[in-house]
């Protein structure tokens, strides 16, 4: 049997975020939360591993208390247990601190063979939590895996790197982050959704996990967020087509888009 933990992130729905016209800052108040899309691929792969080799599938997330309800989506997919790691200062924590909390939570679960996560989160897409977590747990890891073949002794992970396909063999315990191409996450039915709404979610705080406040002091603080403002130039040539084409070519050369213009 393979004991598997899926590490998921509950974050804002980036498709619903709007920008303040005056400050160019994102308006996050009132934006709904969602499970990061890539983490549903991780859950699907965990469930396929369970179907093949047995074991239990659990999900762990670190986030605000509001993340509880979104965890139920992963329970509905098939997770048998769900754990929420939170802290009063959660919004101030950096990746290193969150990694320490998640590592402590996974260790508290006991014997774990396989940790799966999405390649990155949909909000910041840094892709650093998987390697950080593997380092904190002291286990081998591979990121951006597009094909996973687990067996009783370990797993084979395949990923694309440029023009190459790399294949790795890892023993258990191991941590793997997965790309969206690896599978198509299942959609739970109504009975599974209703059943998930009744299952308990265990909540752990930093002190519960034995993580001291000093260990959570952020080394990096987010100073601010601003949207990128794209300025478009609408240049119209109202001449006859041959003359308009000539002016267009001259304009593109002047901008350095075509050869023969400014550098």
Please tell me what each predicted stretch does:
Residues 1-263:
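N-terminal glycine-rich FAD/FM-binding segment characteristic of electron-transfer flavoproteins
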């Amino acid at each position: 049997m393979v004991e598997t933990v899926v590490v998921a992130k509950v974050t804002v729905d980036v498709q619903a975020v709007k920008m303040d016209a005056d400050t160019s800052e994102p308006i996050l108040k009132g934006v709904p939360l969602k499970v990061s899309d890539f983490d549903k691929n991780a859950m699907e792969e965990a469930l396929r591993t369970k179907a093949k080799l047995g074991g239990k599938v659990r999900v762990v997330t670190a986030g605000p208390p509001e993340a509880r309800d979104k965890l139920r989506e992963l329970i509905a997919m098939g997770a048998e247990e769900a754990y929420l790691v939170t802290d009063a200062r959660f919004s101030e924590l950096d990746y290193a601190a969150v990694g320490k909390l998640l590592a402590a939570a996974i260790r508290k679960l006991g014997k774990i063979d396989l940790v799966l996560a999405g390649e990155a989160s949909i909000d910041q897409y840094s892709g650093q939590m998987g390697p950080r977590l593997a380092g904190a747990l002291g286990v081998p890891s591979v990121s951006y895996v597009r094909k996973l073949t687990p067996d009783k002794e370990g797993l084979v992970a395949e990923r694309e790197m440029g023009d190459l396909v790399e294949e790795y063999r890892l023993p258990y315990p191991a941590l793997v982050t997965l790309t969206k191409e690896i599978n198509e996450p299942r959609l739970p039915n109504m009975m599974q959704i209703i059943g998930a709404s009744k299952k308990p979610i265990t909540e752990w705080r930093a002190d519960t996990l034995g993580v001291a406040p000093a260990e959570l002091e952020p080394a990096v603080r987010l100073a601010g967020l601003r949207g990128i403002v794209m300025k478009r130039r609408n240049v119209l040539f109202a001449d006859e087509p041959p003359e308009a084409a000539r002016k267009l070519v001259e304009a593109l050369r002047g901008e350095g888009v075509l050869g023969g213009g400014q550098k």
